[in-house]
């Protein structure tokens, strides 16, 4: 399956590795040129994962059209408060048959909507059809 991971931070990079390890073709999108260049050239993301090496099969791009081209699954791993702004820019590129998994936590400050509700509102999808993946670590 071709997967577009949108967000090249710690969570996006980690999920990209897990998805490649599961046998998927993965491309990661990010805004930071230095991070994208490092992922492509050195298979690392030192700003997020320190010395951890990423799979050689992982490619990265700053071009959202390239990232979404042919994607069967989109994994959202961008900052929560930038979700609406990004989706408004991208919505013409995201067809209704592409599955979406949101890893975003919290609520949109300006509307008090959950991230799945923002996705539903902007993309015109039933919020029950949006998968939400979260992970919280508890230290006792």
Q: Where are the regions that the model predicts?
A:
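Conserved short-loop catalytic and cofactor-binding motifs
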Residues: 27, 55, 103, 107
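N-terminal Rossmann-like dinucleotide/flavin-binding domain of flavoprotein oxidoreductases
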Residues: 54-57, 66
